[in-house]
């Protein structure tokens, strides 16, 4: 009886945590972004691990680095996905945002062609955030549906 319970517990844990590199899933829900280096490191780890990415809400600013780091075929979007893009910036001595052209170009060059074209059609990366969602986003990335693996993250 104890052995049967342990097997059931292990099976449930395996299903919920997505054990196995090819089965694990990272779910992005409401990510406002942050420092570029932090996100490059995070998503490089996801790329190397073989994990899949579900974008199921806001992914803004540095969060969008996922698009240029994780292979396209391992990213999917739900109907709630919303990507926000803007120029990269650094704070000045007073804490004001100063656009960083080099970092902006680096970010831009990481994005897939379809995303770069969409950004270009809206005037490029500027201090103003532009959002990609709905049909336009769905035309660029495959749709995904939540399952128990995604809900556990």
Where are each of the predicted segments found?
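Bacterial N-terminal signal peptides that target proteins for export
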Residues: 1-9
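Intrinsically disordered, low-complexity linkers and terminal tails enriched in Pro/Gly
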Residues: 16-19, 153
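Cleft-lining beta-strand/loop regions that shape enzyme active-site pockets
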Residues: 25-81, 87-91
């Amino acid at each position: 009886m104890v052995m049967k319970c342990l097997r059931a517990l292990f099976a449930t844990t395996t299903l919920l945590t997505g054990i196995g590199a090819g089965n694990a899933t990272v779910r992005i829900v409401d990510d406002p972004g942050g420092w570029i280096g932090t996100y490059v490191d995070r998503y490089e780890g996801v790329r190397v691990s073989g994990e899949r990415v579900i974008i199921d809400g806001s992914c803004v600013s540095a969060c969008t680095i996922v698009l240029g780091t994780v292979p396209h075929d391992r990213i999917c979007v739900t109907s709630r996905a919303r990507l926000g893009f803007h120029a990269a910036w650094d704070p000045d001595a007073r804490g004001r945002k100063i656009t960083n052209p080099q970092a902006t170009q680096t970010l831009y060059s990481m994005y897939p062609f379809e995303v770069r074209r969409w950004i270009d059609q809206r005037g490029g990366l500027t201090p103003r955030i532009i959002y990609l969602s709905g049909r336009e986003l769905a035309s660029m990335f495959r749709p995904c549906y939540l399952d128990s693996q995604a809900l556990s993250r």
